[in-house]
Amino acid sequence: MSNLRFRCLVDSDFCDIAPFEPYIEKGSLDMGLALIAFDESELDTIKNLLKEAQLEGSNGYLYILSQGSIEKKGKMPNSITKAYRYYKRYKKKQNRAAAHIEKELSHSGDGIKKVSGGRFSAYKYTDRENKMCFPFRLRASKNKNKPLFILLHGAGAMGSDNFKQLFDNIPLYKQLLKTDCNILLPQAPFGSNRGESMQNYIKSIKRLVDELPADFDRKRIYIIGTSFGGCCVWQLVYLFPEYFAAAVPVMGGLCLDCDYEKYDIGRLVKTPIWAAHSSDDTNVKIDSDDYYAAELKKLGADIKYTRWDKYGHTMSGKFYRTEKGADGV
C-alpha cells in the first residue's frame, strides 16, 4: 500500500500514503485500485482525474476502479475517515509553515542570524536561492579544527520552535557531548519531508554548513540522521559525494519508491556509510537500504549495514545506545 498516492479533491494535492497507513484497516483497500469520493455526483470528476491507481481523499464513499468502470463499495471505513481528517490537519500545518517561510524570505536577508547564546546557541538560517528558512542549534567547540557532526531529526520534530530537535535522539547526544566536537542541529520546517520542499531543505543544509561561523575541520564533517533525517542523509551523500567524511542513515532510505535505476550508485561509493534499519519497520520500508547495502558491497564500497528484525520504527534509540554509531564514524 505504501506505493499508493493519497489525493485530496479540496486542493488537488498529492502526498505519500505512508503517513496514513496506521489509520487504514488491513484489508479495507486491496490491489492499489481504491479511490474515495465525497459523493456520487463527483464520480465524473474523479474519472477525469484518475491517470493511474491512486487514492482520492474524503469522508464519503469508497469505490473500486476495475477495467475502466467504477464500482461503488459502500460507505467509507471509519479508519479512512480518520486518515482524511489527519490529512486536513497536516495540510493546515504545512500551509501555515509555508506562509511563515514566505514571510521570512520577504523580511530577512540571506545567511545566518544569531538569536541567542548558550551551550547550544540558537540561530536562524535564510536561503533565498532554495526558498528555505529554518532555525538551528550549534554547539561550537572551544578548540579549532575539531570535527563537525550534523544531526538530522525525524519528521516528529519538524517545526520552528528550535527546540524539539534537541530531544530527538538523546542517546546519540550523550555520546557526542562527551567528545570535543562541533554539533549542528537544524530543524526542518513542517511539511519539508516530501517533494520539492524536501529537496530545498536538503540543499539548504549543505549551504548552511558552508557558511557556518564555527572554525571546524572541513575534512571531518559527519552526518547522522533518523527516519526522515535518515532519508536526508542518503540524499545529501548522493548529491554531494566526497563532501562528508562519513554518514550514518538510520531507518531512512535513498529510493523509497524502489525505482533504483534513476540513481547513479557510483556517487555513493565515495562516502563511508553505516546504515541501520529493521525489517519490521512499517513507517519507512527497509527495501531501499537492503538494495543499496548489497549493491555497494558488490562494488567494494566502505559500507556497514546493521539489519535487525525487531524494534520496528523505534530501533534508533537501541541502535545509538548499543552500537554507538557516533563512535563508529
Regions found by a protein language model. Name each.
Residues L148, L152-K203:
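Active-site machinery of serine-nucleophile hydrolases
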Residues L50-A53, L62, I70, G74-L148, ...:
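A domain-start/cap signature at the N-terminus of enzymes
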Residues M1-Y63:
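N-terminal accessory nucleic-acid engagement/regulatory domains that precede
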Residues K219-R267:
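Primarily recognizes the serine-hydrolase "nucleophile elbow" in alpha/beta-hydrolase
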Residues N193-S227:
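Gly/Ser-rich "nucleophile elbow"/oxyanion-hole loop immediately N-terminal to the catalytic nucleophile
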Residues A276, T282, D287-A293, K297-V329:
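C-terminal catalytic histidine-bearing segment of alpha/beta-hydrolase fold enzymes
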Residues L152-G154, M251, H277:
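The conserved beta1-alpha1 loop
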Residues K270-H277:
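Catalytic His-Asp charge-relay segment
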